[in-house]
Amino acid sequence: MSDGSDDDTNNDGNYCKNVSYNFLIQRLAEVSNRKCLLLPKKKNRVDYISIMQTAEFYPELVNSSPPLEPGFTSCEVFVVDKKVDKDTLHLDNFSPYHIGATRRTLERQHSYFYRVNESGNFVPAIKTNGTHILRILVSILGSCPALNRKIYRMVKIESQNKNCLPSLIVYTFEPGHEIPKPNAPAILRRQTSDEIQKILNIPGTSFSQAHSEAVLNRFYDDLPIRDEASDQKRARYSIESTSSTNNQLNEINSFVVPKFEGRQESEQLFRDVKVEQFEESAEISINNRALSPHIQPSKTSVVNRPNQQNRKFQNYDMFSAGVISTATVPAPMFHPHITPIADLKDDDGYDPEELTQRNKLASLYRLVDLFRWSQGIYNHITVRVSTDPDEILINAFGQLYSEVSASSLIKVDLDGTVIDGGSTNFGVNQAGYVLHSAIHNGRPEVKCVVHLHHPSVVAVSAQKCGLLPISQESMIVGDVGYHEYRGILIDEAERALLVRDLGDRNVMILRNHGFVVCGESIEHALSLTYHLIIACETQIRTVPGGNTDNVHFPAQSAIKQVYKVASQGGGGVNRQNGHVNSMQWKKGELEWQAYMRQLDAQGYVTGNVPN
């Protein structure tokens, strides 16, 4: 099931001030000894904000304390007095959600900026001109992913600890699933994986076509269509759903709302969007701005046009890249045809930190391609946006890694909503969204996540012994987690399993699939990826069949010493001024700068600022 903060498929940017009181009072019932609004289906942010505003004037809808348990129906909305603080709101019989260091739920928080217009309606805003923040805390019980709880709080920016409207506690429960017991252990143990798969309808090896299409359609229906004219005001866009979606919503639930009078103001703030019909293949087209013809100046000269011999070599390399590596130690093989990486200008409207991240992430995609680790348009790498921890940058699904540039990267939040569609007409890989959103949400300290299918790592992932500490590179990588293969990663319910299996490690091997690397920076992620691949290539040459009878294993003290030393900047061995002075370099930064110098020398225009 989706654990996004809401389903904004019917959001046109106009927020009505009041929901019909008659509509709400007809759905008022008693659940868990509390007043509850029983709705046939979960709503979107528009509707929830309207309920909060209406409840402000009708105290008979408001509870003085949160419920202890849900009633396990499709959608239950508990309105709670605005005087109840945020710490009290999340307490129920399934709390505490964290006991000691054990994570008992998958949790995430989302923040949306608004301002109040002259008609008293909330309209979306950017951080610079917003006056209010809608805080949404999403919690999914690990032992029962069918149970979803969201807490909605509207606060003013200047007093974020004080609610300005009644809060909402929304429980949604998918019928047909077993009702969880209060305080049931939420850790998904391996011995219960078969039961979890049965509950979630996850086949053992692959997904049925109907199930896969349903998941894809649900994901793509949540994606906003990007306006072609949003180059100067990227944060100002609206979402219009297809007519079929609107008809369906009107049949299921009809909020009786007064006509919005501030339409003219809304039209000035939010541009109209051209809606494209969704095809049965679940593909989506995102209207984007054209690729900027401007690039950042480079101090290096662009390489000359390649001759015919080089072109033939590149064609061969393109088809073999990432499939078979003949090098003992991976080394970049540079292409004669070069697309500049840093193709955005400083005045394109991006935050300087995000612009640097875009250049770095695009450079990492190029390095992965040049190392011959890529597989066409597949696999994915993400980085958390420094200005908003709930947003990540990812490649456009349809581009080769040799085509990725700063402008083509897509910015998406952890709910799957596209914030900036980049310079292409491509969308986001659903498997990439499921994997990366889970890790970025479960591990807030992780900044960069790399997922690749390198053949050597896949070979080790298929060995029962897993990664062995038989090379220095494997010791540098450190402790590794393992995730069992359950088919292509398109089911969002598998995110809790991914977070559990990763734990606090930086590397996770996906059985019969590939690997995931988590870095505290882009540079760190590349360094870990590099050493993991070398370690796996060494292992499949040493123990191709997994027989370790004739293998020498180093002492545990040596293994720990290698990891401790290598975990420092400069690999822990950078000697300067008569002593080891590695701390001036962050993890992976020393070799990253070397790669950037080489890329710029070849004319890739990385936009890198040398240290």
Swiss-Prot record:
One of its GO terms (molecular function) is actin filament binding. GO terms for cellular component: cytoplasm; cytoskeleton; plasma membrane; postsynaptic density. It is a peripheral membrane protein. It comes from Caenorhabditis elegans. This is Adducin-related protein 2. The keyword Lipid biosynthesis does not apply. Membrane-cytoskeleton-associated protein that promotes the assembly of the spectrin-actin network. The keyword Magnesium does not apply. It is found in: Cytoplasm, Cytoskeleton; Cell membrane. Pfam families: Aldolase_II. Its main location: cytoplasm. Keywords: Actin-binding, Cell membrane, Cytoplasm, Cytoskeleton, Membrane. Belongs to the aldolase class II family. Adducin subfamily. It comes from the Eukaryota.
